[in-house]
């Protein structure tokens, strides 16, 4: 008999101008902004001014300016905080003053008093020379802003006195860092202010050095930067598609736009690398305008961090730099700007990032991902007092999104013991990893396989750190209309009950439906426990329990503060209406299992029942030795073997040794 089966087997895993109205702009401004000579430095500065041009409102800040001293009365210049560094406010305001002074449409255009405030303010800053305990402010944020300010003032009616500009630039050169000593996004960010300084000084040697360093991170590496699997690492072998991924795209596309059409233009090969990462990874991890929370690193603990609408700028730049893919960028921009729905022009895609221990599954109707950690990668960090409850996020956490906003700003009210996808003891205190910056995983079995459309991922771990004392074998089987999630070998000696959380997201206004013994019930607010329900339906996503289990469901308000997870944020209490669903494995489970199916795009009990009858999913094994799922409709088999074993089903026999 001839069999035509599509088999996916996982055996062992080793492995981002103002153009003022010309009718209103003065001819002097035009002549200054667009010099007639062919000076490359001036060309670059024209583009930089165009990139940052604005028409700011500055009246509020003027009332806080001490004219005699050149400082602001509401700024404590002695602060050295590692985050939200207060003294930088001084430079931010002078920056706005500079754009107000040079913009013909601004009330303070060519205003002598504003000019004097800018000069006096720069003198004050130079003499005071505030310093932050976080190098990033000293070597990136401050010198970048000052460089742009000085470039903008070059087109002012009066320019910054030469002596003041020179000594300011000399200090930036001395104290602003060397890009060659850094990697990835940090290198590009430092190179940016080297570009600004080099243009102001007309220093070709430093400009070439700056551009070489700005471009050098655009290559594949096994260290920090773009990985061969098309993911991105920063702070060691740590997944950072968002966060530092934002920064590297902001900086590299920015520089590439400056140099386009000049002898310093970015090479075709590097543009292609950026294009691949942006189209196939970065923007795929954004649903609508919201990025998946588990690729943001410690940034997850910052308010509004998942909203990536501002990154439309990166795609707009790439539409110019990479016109071959302009239609893809147009679709990305339309989704980010809410001009089209979250599913607009999305195509089926399945990627397992073997370097990053990360899986991304995209369908027009939904996006689902899995983040794991192994001895090859680092757990999600919690440095600078941020992301303080992140511990379990690296242990098989999942995002389930259709619109993209399902988790928007939920995080202060999250129960961080119940991160979606994870199996974890409900400890009184959430552990903090051994290191705040880089803690390597312990699993030697984490990874997946993909044919670019379908795939399977698995994660086996035993965590004995800080009283967690819990392990499991977890697998995810990815198809078109569903994701099948299996767990086996769940063991724990922790004092706390062990839960597998299926989802914890914002509660939708519509009803939650539950079916038990084929009887449907509308769930009210509260906490509930069920023995082997058929399914639960919430916000257009169905959750099916083909092998039963003790299910907990919470449908209620949760509270917390941003400060709880990020000590740079507000202590004001936040309330969120939250939906939580999962398995209660009890205390000290021994070789326990779970099985659930995620079925997005279902909106009614009738559709749920119809799906259950015709989904074609067979769970053929869910043991500590193997997990096997067959999709009869697609004629796809997906298998995970954790150790030696034999699988037999009808005429199929597979032996793994």
Question: What is each of the regions a protein language model found here?
Answer:
Residues 255-655:
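Extended polysaccharide-engagement surfaces of secreted carbohydrate-active enzymes
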Residues 25-88:
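Low-complexity, Ser/Thr/Pro/Gly-enriched N-terminal "stalk/linker" regions
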Residues 28, 32, 36-39, 43, ...:
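Alpha-helix boundary/N-cap detector
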Residues 31-42, 82-91, 131-138, 193, ...:
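Short N-terminal helix-initiation segments at or just after the protein's N-terminus
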Residues 26-27, 41, 58, 162-165, ...:
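Short amphipathic alpha-helical segments that mediate assembly, nucleic-acid/protein binding
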Residues 1-27:
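Bacterial Sec-dependent N-terminal signal peptides
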Residues 27-31, 35, 117, 487-491:
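N-terminal functional module detector in eukaryotic proteins
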Residues 62-302:
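Aromatic-lined, polymer-binding surfaces characteristic
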């Amino acid at each position: 008999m001839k069999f035509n089966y599509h088999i996916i087997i996982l055996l062992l895993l080793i492995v981002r101008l103002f153009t003022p109205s010309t009718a209103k702009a003065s001819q002097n401004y035009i002549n200054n902004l667009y010099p007639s000579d062919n000076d490359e430095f001036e060309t670059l500065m024209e583009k930089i001014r165009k990139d940052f041009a604005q028409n700011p409102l500055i009246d509020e800040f003027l009332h806080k300016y001490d004219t005699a001293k050149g400082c602001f009365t509401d700024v404590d210049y002695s602060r050295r905080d590692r985050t939200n560094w207060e003294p930088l406010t001084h430079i931010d305001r002078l920056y706005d003053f500079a754009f107000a002074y040079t913009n013909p449409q601004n009330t303070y255009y060519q205003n002598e008093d504003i000019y004097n405030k800018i000069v006096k303010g720069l003198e004050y800053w130079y003499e005071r020379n505030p310093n932050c305990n976080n190098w990033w402010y000293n070597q990136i944020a401050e010198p970048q802003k000052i460089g742009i300010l000085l470039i903008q003032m070059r087109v002012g009616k009066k320019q910054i006195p030469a002596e003041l500009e020179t000594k300011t630039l000399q200090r930036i050169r001395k104290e602003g860092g060397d890009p060659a000593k850094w990697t990835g996004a940090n290198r590009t960010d430092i190179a940016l202010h080297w570009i600004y300084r080099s243009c102001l000084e007309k220093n070709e040697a430093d400009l070439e050095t700056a551009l070489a360093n700005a471009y050098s991170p655009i290559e594949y590496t096994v260290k920090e930067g773009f990985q061969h699997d098309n993911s991105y690492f920063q702070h060691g072998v740590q997944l950072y598609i968002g966060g530092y991924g934002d920064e590297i795209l902001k900086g590299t596309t920015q520089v590439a736009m400056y140099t386009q059409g000049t002898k310093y233009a970015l090479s075709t090969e590097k543009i292609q690398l950026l294009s691949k990462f942006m189209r196939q990874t970065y923007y795929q991890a954004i649903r609508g305008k919201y990025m998946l929370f588990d690729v943001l690193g410690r940034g997850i603990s910052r308010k509004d961090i998942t909203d990536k609408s501002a990154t439309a700028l990166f795609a707009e730049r790439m539409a110019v730099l990479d016109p071959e893919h302009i239609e893809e960028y147009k679709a990305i921009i339309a989704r980010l700007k809410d001009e089209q729905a979250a599913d607009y022009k999305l195509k089926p895609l399945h990627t397992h990032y073997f370097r990053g221990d990360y899986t991304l599954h995209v369908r027009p109707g939904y996006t689902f991902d899995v983040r794991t950690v192994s001895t090859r990668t680092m757990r999600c960090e919690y440095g600078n007092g941020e992301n303080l409850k992140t511990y379990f996020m690296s242990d098989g956490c999942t995002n389930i999104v259709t619109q993209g906003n399902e988790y928007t700003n939920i995080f202060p009210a999250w129960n961080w013991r119940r991160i979606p996808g994870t199996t974890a003891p409900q400890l009184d205190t959430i552990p903090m990893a051994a290191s705040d910056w880089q803690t390597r995983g312990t699993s030697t079995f984490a990874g997946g396989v993909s044919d670019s459309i379908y795939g399977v991922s698995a994660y086996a771990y035993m965590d004995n750190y800080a009283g967690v004392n819990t392990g499991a074998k977890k697998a995810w089987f990815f198809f078109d209309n569903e994701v099948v999630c299996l767990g086996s070998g769940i063991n724990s000696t922790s004092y706390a009950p062990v839960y597998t959380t299926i989802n914890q997201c914002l509660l939708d206004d519509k009803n939650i439906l539950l079916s038990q013994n084929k009887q449907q019930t509308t769930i009210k607010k509260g906490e509930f426990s069920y023995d082997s329900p058929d399914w639960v339906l919430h916000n257009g996503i169905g959750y099916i329990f083909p092998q039963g289990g003790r299910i907990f469901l919470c449908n209620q308000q949760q509270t917390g503060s941003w400060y709880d997870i990020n000590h740079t944020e507000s202590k004001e209490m936040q309330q969120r209406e939250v939906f939580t669903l999962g398995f209660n494995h009890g205390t000290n489970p021994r070789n326990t299992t779970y099985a659930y199916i995620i079925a997005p795009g279902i909106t009614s009990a009738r559709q749920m029942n119809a799906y259950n009858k015709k989904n074609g999913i067979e769970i053929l094994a869910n043991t500590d030795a193997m997990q096997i799922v067959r999709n009869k409709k697609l004629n796809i088999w997906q298998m995970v073997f954790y150790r030696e074993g034999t699988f037999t089903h009808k005429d199929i026999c597979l032996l793994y040794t």
